[in-house]
Amino acid sequence: MVPGDITTRTGGYIYDARVADGLRSLGWTIDVRTLDGSFPRPSPAALAHAMGVLAGITAGARVIVDSLALGAMPDVIAAHASRLRIAALMHLPLAADVSADPDTRADVAAAEGRALSAVSLVIVTGTATEALLSRYRLPAGRVVVVEPGTDPAPLARGSGAGPVALLCVAAVHRGKGHEALLQALSEVANRGWRLVCAGDLTRDPDMVGRVMTMRTRLGLQDRVSFLGDLSASDLNEHYDRAALIVSPSRQETYGMAVADALARGIPVVATATGAIPKLVGSEAGLVVPVDDTASLAGALSRAIGDADLRRLLAAGARRVRARLPTWDDAAARMAAALTSLGTS
């Protein structure tokens, strides 16, 4: 059960779609049920629709509910928990969203905790998510980690001569750190670089407006491009031309765009959130603290200004590339988790 369009090209939806496809390839029958797009702040009609969707599922069936919806409908989950084998698929707990105010997070945590206590299994997309769920004191045996995969990809060719091509792959919203990135880049304006930002521009219009205004105020409009959501083929072209991937995110539970970059042997400058420090290590990029613009600017200055360093980090990225999990691996782990749900 997924709120909105599962073909949406953001991390959580990509995960859901790829794992569903992988399970089908393993012989599982997968039926995606679409919930109203108003989640995680559902209207009464959206909750009624979700109740009806669950009511229409055969008793005893396995049901995976995406975290974007689960924590916002604890009463709906509780009403069907004894009849269905419900698994929560937790990307980012709603109560852990850093863009929400503390009072809102407290209310959301209470609702999310009730929903999680009712399900039979909790599937998390990384150990960072697992840590964020510690507040709910879930039994250890009920939580299973199924990390995202990557697709085998050719090594990126890079930007060649001229400005260093930077690529940031992230929807523009409060948690992704675009303001910090622009500020950091303004501090290394004397370096030769260009930045392409690929990611949805409709999710958080207020933040998009702030970022565009900031780009103009800093005089970066000729060096920073926001292309919006790209097709897979167009995004692959930008990966192929990138010399560095930049991920300034304030909060990730894994870091799929970083993993996709490493799958192409592209070095990374990123913030230390989610699985990014583990993915990148010390060999494939430079990792800086979250919300530390000075450190981000320093890392960018080093990576942009030192071609030998970029070559060294690219060699490290190629080594990491060889050991990244695939989407087939993710599907196999999900199948094992769901099989255990069926015999519990």
Residue ranges, per PLM feature:
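Carbohydrate-associated surface elements
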Residues: 128, 149
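Aromatic "clamp/platform" in nucleotide-sugar-dependent glycosyltransferases that forms part
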Residues: 250
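Membrane-proximal helix-turn-helix segments that form the acceptor-binding/catalytic region
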Residues: 103-122
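Short hydrophobic beta-strand element within catalytic cores of glycosyltransferases
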Residues: 267-270
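Conserved acidic donor-binding segment of nucleotide-sugar-dependent glycosyltransferases
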Residues: 282, 286-293, 302-308
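Short alpha-helical donor nucleotide-sugar binding micro-motif in glycosyltransferases
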Residues: 229-230, 237-242
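Conserved donor-binding/catalytic core segment of Leloir-type glycosyltransferases
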Residues: 123, 157-176, 182-187, 196
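Glycosyltransferase donor-sugar binding loop
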Residues: 194-212, 228
